[in-house]
């Protein structure tokens, strides 16, 4: 008989417990709800409302009317600038292609794939090292290089919907983080120890611009100790300092790169000119210079005869006197001035020219007070010379463009320019351009800036260049394949050599240029060859330039485990990356410290793998390409014979005696088999054995792998068999597919194992298709089995296994594996108790070369951990500064003023007011290189490391997405409100339990922080008052075995 429901309710008349209270309903007003009807809002209302939410500029006439908002605003304008969050997301998107076309399009041949790999692994030092090795001005070029015409233009992701990678922004970010580390450059130990008399030869470089700084840096890395750069100005940096505006290239960046050159012994003398009265080539040679590099650029403007007689007083500038004047007044630290006025630009400005310099002049004029700027040029938009980045910047800042216009006359009244007249230009059927005198345009203006290029024509400079031959244009005659002049001891690069058009190409003229068919050697290498030849040392034509080097690269990351010395703790796991002997050899050649062979057995247990067997994991959602969070495999052990692997071990140990070979072996549960295979492997020369007792699929049917590894008794007995027959260390491989991995590890130790490997893959069923079939599916019958999941998805499981074994068996060696994909994640395993690190899925995601990133990353982490001045850093990540879109916030702490709609307009007005009152030459907000550099008392070794709150939201960084609000509503405690007008979330402290869900889902790192509660802690909302209120734990402790120890206060506090 069915019992009758109890209808008596003691809470009759009270509010429903299963329904939100009115205050919570009010809080939930903006929380998403399932929509049951179609929306219908009049377009007129939407048109009006959208202005309340806009984050971009208004379009149409109203957007450009009124005074410029840019006066005195020299803040970073680059769209490519990234925060750490943006850099990581962009780097993770990169495909890291084979034979990367982006690198082929870079004049300095940066290893772009490698440095982006390092960024995605949070190894910013490794990325900066890769960049600065090929380009000593890597930060400068990251900021101003026209990447759309170079590396970005060749990015394979141009063929995808999401578009090319922001390579320049990533380069800028990595180098900027290294700049903040404040670590000096040094000459490598190898070079220092191999210096000879030739390295004491004098080398002179004229002009302290990009080409000279680059050339001098490479020569210093080659070991030369007497290198001097002569600069005619009182400040250094050449065009980078004088002619590229602060909002594109801050002076502290130039200062940083020059400091790196000085670190390796480059000397710089300012106020030294190339002229008969001071420096000439003949004088330098007579004073002992063995080689000279000329990098003076083109110092004089090309001026149309139309403008002869016009001066600044009339309102006429050239780019060569305008941009330096702007720089002197807006670049803190450049000339040591405390305050210098900007050139006054009240009214209308016309800029003549269509190159990058013209765009810089135009956008600078807006910051000097111009109300309107027009850029006039002879041809149409399709023939414009400026790179797209510069063109778009000028367009966004509301510069006007006047194409097909050639200046014919400037009208002056009362000593001031009042207008400029243009002839329209036309192109005939033969493609020839001409001016149409019948079509005239008159443009009223107050200032004219000529940006028609530059040249070298000053007689005193040309005479100082003798005996070098000049070309028909008056420049230096240079062999473009060697950068050598008519005088064998004189070299030239940059603008003065007539080839380079950009900073990155000037940098390259100081190093080497890759042609499609062969390498062209130029200045630094050829100067090195020339000097060495004088001393009887013949060098090949292929450049061999040393890489960028710092004290970080001297950190020792070797490890001693069980008496075996590992060069570094990174090795390849027994997995697809070690399928064959040649693959193991290539791994050693790339720098891996050790390898494990693919697991092999006796010939009687040979297997044949099925196909398909390794598939993309579903743990990362619809993510295709690299950076998969997991793989699922039903891979079996090696298909190759036992003798094949024994011979490979012999060859590998013979040719790579300092590398460690670990033989991964597997047998059925049979004493004779284990003894035979173990002794053969030891005799072949294996340094260590790994006993595969944990393969989760395919081998259990034969009584191998997991069939043995889940029983402590069987593991212990197998270990005893192996211990009795071999002297080398051996490590049973643990399975995570068990209740307590510590029991198996304890059994292995008791059986005489030297240590354990933790862990193998996690048994899983990854994909189930809509038709009910699993993937992978084998053959026509579509058979499958539970496979092994690997990759970062299993890292928490593997980390727990390593930590629990290390806590249970103090000092017991552990080879860790399972989701190790960077130096940072590897260091985490080492700190949890691992001795060395095995890698598999990360190589499947990329290639063998990731080991270089891991090694440099680990060295940097160890080095920086010893620096007291960087104690606020998290590994290689600097403290998160308040920012929007990667740029610092000028006005902080403005409550109820988000960055959209009318609030944005109000913020811009306040910012303009603050900028108008600010001193542009104040250095307080810039990070200049300082020496001595970051000091480290003691660098830890790898072996050294082997062993209540509420939320607060930072409205300066918040992007108003409401993710915190939604997750707190539907997965938490309804402790966050969300303003309907400002879209600003607010945490109600009394309701916040400190669960950190909001912190976990926030897309902006450190926008939400967990801080100590200000008010007294209140008891949880019990819903219905309990009959007994248990005591609140005062202290929560965990013992070494992971058991919780409670010390109760006996009552509420």
From Swiss-Prot:
Binding of FAD occurs at 207-211, 231-239, 248, 274, 494-503
Binding residues annotated for substrate, in chain numbering: 633, 692-694, 760-761
Residue intervals of the 4Fe-4S ferredoxin-type domain: 84-115, 949-981, 983-1013
GO BP, one example? thymine catabolic process
Q: Which GO terms describe its cellular component?
A: cytosol
Annotated catalytic residues: 695 (proton acceptor)
The entry's function note states:
Involved in pyrimidine base degradation. Catalyzes the reduction of uracil and thymine. Also involved the degradation of the chemotherapeutic drug 5-fluorouracil.
Protein name, UniProt field: Probable dihydropyrimidine dehydrogenase [NADP(+)]
Species name for this entry?
Caenorhabditis briggsae
């Amino acid at each position: 008989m069915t019992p009758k429901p109890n209808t008596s309710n003691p809470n009759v008349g009270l509010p429903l417990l299963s329904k939100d209270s009115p205050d919570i309903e009010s809080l939930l007003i903006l929380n998403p709800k399932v929509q049951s009807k179609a929306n219908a809002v009049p377009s007129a209302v939407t048109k009006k409302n959208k202005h309340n939410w806009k984050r971009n500029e208004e379009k149409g006439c109203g957007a450009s009317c009124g005074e410029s908002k840019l006066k005195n605003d020299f803040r970073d304008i680059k769209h490519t600038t990234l925060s750490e969050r943006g850099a990581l997301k962009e780097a993770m998107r990169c495909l890291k292609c084979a034979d990367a076309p982006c690198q082929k399009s870079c004049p300095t041949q940066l290893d772009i794939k490698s440095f982006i790999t390092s960024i995605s692994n949070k190894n910013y030092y490794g990325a900066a090292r890769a960049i600065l090795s090929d380009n000593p001005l890597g930060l400068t070029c990251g900021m101003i290089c026209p990447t759309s015409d170079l590396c970005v233009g060749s990015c394979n992701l141009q063929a995808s919907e999401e578009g090319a990678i922001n390579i320049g922004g990533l380069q800028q970010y990595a180098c900027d983080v290294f700049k903040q580390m404040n670590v000096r450059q040094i000459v490598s130990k190898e070079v220092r120890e191999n210096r000879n008399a030739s390295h004491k030869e004098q080398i002179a470089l004229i002009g302290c611009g990009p080409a000279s700084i680059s050339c001098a840096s490479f020569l210093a890395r080659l070991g030369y100790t007497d290198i001097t750069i002569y600069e005619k100005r009182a400040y250094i940096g050449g065009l980078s300092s004088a002619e590229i505006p602060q909002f594109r290239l801050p002076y502290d960046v130039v200062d940083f790169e020059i400091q790196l050159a000085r670190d390796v012994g480059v000397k710089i003398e300012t106020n030294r000119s190339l002229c008969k009265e001071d420096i000439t080539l003949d004088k330098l040679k007579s004073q002992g210079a063995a080689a000279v590099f000329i990098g003076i650029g083109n110092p004089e403007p090309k001026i149309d005869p139309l403008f002869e007689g016009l001066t600044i007083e009339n309102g006429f500038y050239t780019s060569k006197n305008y941009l330096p004047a702007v720089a002197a007044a807006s670049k803190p630290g450049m000339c040591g001035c405390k305050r210098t006025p900007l050139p006054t630009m009240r009214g209308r400005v016309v800029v003549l020219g269509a190159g990058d310099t013209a765009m810089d002049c135009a956008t600078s004029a807006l910051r000097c007070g111009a109300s309107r700027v027009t850029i006039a040029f002879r041809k149409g938009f399709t023939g414009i010379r400026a790179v797209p980045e510069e063109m778009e910047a000028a367009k966004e800042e509301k510069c006007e463009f006047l194409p097909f216009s050639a200046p014919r006359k400037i009208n002056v009244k009362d000593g001031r320019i009042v207008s400029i007249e243009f002839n329209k230009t036309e192109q005939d059927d033969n493609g020839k351009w001409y001016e149409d005198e019948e079509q005239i345009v008159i443009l009223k203006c107050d200032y004219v800036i000529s940006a028609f290029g530059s040249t070298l024509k000053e007689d005193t400079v040309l005479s100082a260049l003798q005996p070098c031959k000049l070309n028909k244009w008056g420049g230096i005659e240079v062999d473009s394949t060697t950068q050598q002049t008519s005088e064998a001891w004189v070299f030239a690069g940059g603008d003065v050599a007539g080839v380079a058009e950009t900073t990155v190409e000037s940098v390259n003229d100081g190093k080497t240029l890759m042609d499609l068919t062969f390498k062209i050697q130029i200045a630094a290498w050829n100067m090195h060859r020339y000097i060495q030849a004088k001393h009887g040392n013949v060098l090949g034509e292929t450049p061999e330039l040393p890489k960028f080097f710092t004290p970080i690269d001297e950190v020792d990351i070797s490890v001693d485990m069980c008496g075996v010395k590992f060069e570094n703790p990174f090795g390849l796991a027994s997995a697809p990356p070690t399928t064959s002997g040649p693959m193991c050899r290539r791994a050693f050649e790339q720098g891996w410290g050790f390898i494990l062979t693919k697991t092999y057995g006796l010939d009687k247990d040979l297997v044949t793998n099925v196909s398909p067997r390794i598939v993309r994991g579903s743990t990362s959602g619809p993510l295709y390409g690299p950076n998969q969070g997991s793989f699922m495999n039903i891979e079996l052990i090696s298909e190759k014979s036992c003798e094949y692997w024994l011979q490979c071990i012999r060859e590998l140990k013979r040719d790579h005696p300092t590398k460690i070979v670990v033989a991964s072996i597997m047998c059925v549960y049979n004493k004779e088999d284990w003894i035979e295979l173990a002794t053969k492997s030891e005799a072949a020369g294996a340094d260590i054995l790994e006993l595969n007792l944990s393969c989760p699929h395919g081998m259990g049917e034969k009584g191998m792998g997991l069939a043995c590894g889940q029983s402590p008794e069987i593991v212990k007995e197998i270990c005893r068999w192996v211990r009795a027959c071999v002297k080398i260390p051996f490590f049973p491989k643990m399975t995570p597919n068990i209740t307590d991995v510590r029991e198996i590890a304890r059994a292995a130790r008791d059986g005489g194992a030297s240590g354990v490997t933790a862990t193998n893959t996690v048994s899983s069923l990854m994909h189930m298709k809509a038709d009910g079939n699993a993937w992978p599916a084998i053959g026509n019958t579509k058979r499958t089995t539970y496979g092994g999941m690997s990759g970062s998805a299993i890292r928490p499981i593997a980390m727990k296994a390593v930590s629990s074994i290390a806590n249970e068996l103090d000092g017991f060696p552990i080879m860790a594996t399972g989701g190790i994909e960077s130096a940072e994640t590897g260091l985490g395993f080492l700190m949890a108790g691992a001795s060395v690190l095995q890698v598999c899925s990360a190589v499947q995601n990329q290639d063998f070369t990731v080991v270089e990133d891991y090694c440099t990353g680990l060295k940097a982490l160890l080095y920086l951990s010893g620096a007291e001045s960087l104690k606020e850093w998290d590994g290689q990540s600097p403290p998160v500064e308040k920012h929007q879109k990667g740029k610092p916030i000028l006005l902080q702490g403005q409550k109820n003023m988000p960055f959209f709609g009318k609030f944005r307009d109000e913020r811009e007005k306040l910012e303009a007011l603050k900028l108008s009152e600010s001193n542009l030459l104040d250095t307080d907000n810039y990070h200049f290189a300082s020496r001595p550099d970051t000091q480290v008392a003691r660098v830890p070794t790898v072996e050294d490391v082997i062993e209540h709150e509420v939320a607060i939201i930072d409205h300066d960084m918040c992007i108003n997405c409401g993710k915190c609000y939604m997750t707190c509503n539907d997965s938490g405690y309804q402790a966050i409100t969300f303003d309907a007008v400002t879209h600003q979330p607010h945490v109600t402290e009394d309701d916040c339990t400190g669960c950190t869900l909001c912190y976990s889902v926030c897309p902006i790192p450190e926008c939400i922080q967990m801080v100590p509660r200000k008010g007294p802690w209140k008891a949880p909302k019990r819903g219905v008052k309990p009959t007994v209120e248990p005591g609140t734990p005062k202290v929560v402790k965990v013992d070494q075995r992971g058991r919780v120890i409670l010390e109760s206060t006996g009552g509420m506090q």
